[in-house]
């Protein structure tokens, strides 16, 4: 492939319409490149005119032949955005960038630990890249790129707010997140129980910011909302039994011991803490998870 031809791939270009064969237009690039256009990829109701130039996005098909579309993708070789993961396999993550074909993020660019690979529905912050053989891939944004693009926050406006964001970089020391509003958030390893997936939609509580306007966050609940061992055990059993158990502070010590393996006093203290923090309700001789309680499962 000639260098000039490579320069138009993955970008938006003005191409001249030089012919029509069946349902396929023939286009010519600025340096004489031959590009094809299927009629289904025209967004103008009027037919294209032979000899006229129009704006198109140029991309290679799986065989490397150049095609064009007027349906502009979410990303280009000069533009980054979040794109949805369609599937993952041994080759890497296949993503939807708004083109007639899916695009691959090679496995070499994903985390070494497959447990934190993205799954279908996750979204990754990427750009397009074209290799020497005219193959098109998606590339994860680097820390340098995010540093140039994030929206800084220099006050305490976001303090204790819960923000939805997605991890774009995962390290042993912590998780680096980016929100759809451009906030850059770092969650130290001590502020998480487990590492999120790359691209997973997570809720993070803001606990501070630094001099560069980067936010610090936590996946852990506030200290007064954290559960002790007994509270966590009751919570886990509630989740296991679809959020409801026929027990209350009126239940017998024997029944409590049999199911929860704790004394009645410990049980009453634990459900009292859960109730105070609106994690459960206690009524009609039973305990049940609240909406807030169900929400803790994601944490």
Swiss-Prot record:
Stored InterPro entries: CvfB_fam, CvfB_S1_2nd, CvfB_S1_3rd, CvfB_S1_st, CvfB_WH, NA-bd_OB-fold, WH-like_DNA-bd_sf
Pfam families documented for this protein: CvfB_1st, CvfB_2nd, CvfB_WH, S1_2
Family to which this protein belongs: Belongs to the CvfB family.
Protein name per the record: Conserved virulence factor B
Organism: Staphylococcus saprophyticus subsp. saprophyticus (strain ATCC 15305 / DSM 20229 / NCIMB 8711 / NCTC 7292 / S-41)
